[in-house]
Amino acid sequence: MSCPLRPSEAQEGDQLSEECGMLYGEYLMLDKILEAQRLLSEQNNQPVHDEHLFIVTHQAYELWFKQIIYELDSIRNIFSDVLEESQTLEILKRLNRVVLILKVLVDQVMILETMTPLDFMDFRCYLRPASGFQSLQFRLLENKLGVRQENRVKYNQNYSKVFGNDEKALEQIAKSEKEPSLTDLVQRWLERTPGLELEGFNFWGKYQKAVEKLLTEQKELAEKEEAETLKRYKLNDLEKRREVYESIFKVEVHEALMSRGERRFSHKALQGAIMITFYRDEPRFSQPHQILTLLMDIDSLITKWRYNHVLMVQRMIGSSQLGTGGSSGYQYLRSTLSDRYKVFVDLFNLSTFLIPRSYIPPLSTSMRSHLCNWGSANSTNIVSNGNN
């Protein structure tokens, strides 16, 4: 790399030397990276041109996976401690970086699609038994985000078995399963949202009353409908909506949904997410709301990447052939598009529980002051307890 202390007149290419340190290629270890494209098709002295593209694209994926894991680990470390408000901007920056990387990965599939099925068939036989299912980094990425083992689609065997006797890989998998995932840490953070305290602002109690008022008033309007068919439709719709709201108001119903994997966040964390969504315009909830939005973006982009991957696989090998690693190929990949693999599915479903702005419980003077106050002695972070 060029030395920042070198005089400007010494920046010319013919004057580069090692007196100030290593050069560009040495710093990036390009000799190793650029020599890592070994075409198996060359073994028969019949190199397949597109195998080079296949290797480079997947190596690029793995490098980006490494960067995403690096960012996620740093974010999880910040969340592991009491989260200071001054750190939320850093979390936003790193989450946004992950989002932008994932957008690159989604678009990168298009490069592979420049290869035709016949082009792929020319070297596919050399890939067995290697498979994308064996990507250790992608499994670590999933675990660190919060994909649970019980939610994974079965792949003939436990997903970690594909790493065979690779003790280092198995240790990393085991560690990623045991340590708190980003989902776990976000849940703990949401559970400490100021304003949920029963003896304080008691947002949840106020929210339940607001929902009851909304449903009661809408029922009264429905009963005034003269057309019997329309009246019956509106009353039935209101009854269904009441059941939906009761699924979050009744703890036992919420926990039953959690046990079935239909909800992931604890009851208290869900309350915090709803409160942040309602009062996102308040200064101290602005950045937390952006965090929740970026978490959904990450989930969305991973789903889009899976979907693009599914379509590419179907285009290359059809929907009935087995994958090179022995999986059902297209059928297996398509099954990973379900909500089972969405770690922040509860955030997507928050819109189900929204109410019109006019019904949102107004903040008390003390609570509004608390949410507008940055850095008071008793309220230095978003996860501290609000007393009013």
Swiss-Prot record:
Pfam families (alphabetical): Trp_dioxygenase
Cofactor: how and how many bound: Binds 1 heme group per subunit.
SUPFAM superfamilies associated with the record: Indolic compounds 2,3-dioxygenase-like
Cofactor (UniProt): heme
Keyword tags: Dioxygenase, Heme, Iron, Metal-binding, Oxidoreductase, Tryptophan catabolism
Pathway: Amino-acid degradation; L-tryptophan degradation via kynurenine pathway; L-kynurenine from L-tryptophan: step 1/2; Pigment biosynthesis; ommochrome biosynthesis
Enzyme nomenclature, EC number: 1.13.11.11
Binding site for substrate: 54-58, 124, 324
Known catalytic reactions: L-tryptophan + O2 = N-formyl-L-kynurenine
InterPro entries in the cross-refs: Trp/Indoleamine_2_3_dOase-like (IPR037217), Trp_2_3_dOase (IPR004981)
Domain of life: Eukaryota
GO molecular function: heme binding; metal ion binding; tryptophan 2,3-dioxygenase activity
Gene3D superfamilies listed in its UniProt record: 1.10.287.3810, 1.20.58.480
BP GO terms, sorted: L-tryptophan catabolic process to kynurenine; ommochrome biosynthetic process
Cited PANTHER family: TRYPTOPHAN 2,3-DIOXYGENASE
Biological role: Heme-dependent dioxygenase that catalyzes the oxidative cleavage of the L-tryptophan (L-Trp) pyrrole ring and converts L-tryptophan to N-formyl-L-kynurenine. Catalyzes the oxidative cleavage of the indole moiety. Required for normal eye pigmentation.
Similarity comment: family membership: Belongs to the tryptophan 2,3-dioxygenase family.
Subunit field text: Homotetramer. Dimer of dimers.
The protein's name: Tryptophan 2,3-dioxygenase
Species, as recorded: Tribolium castaneum
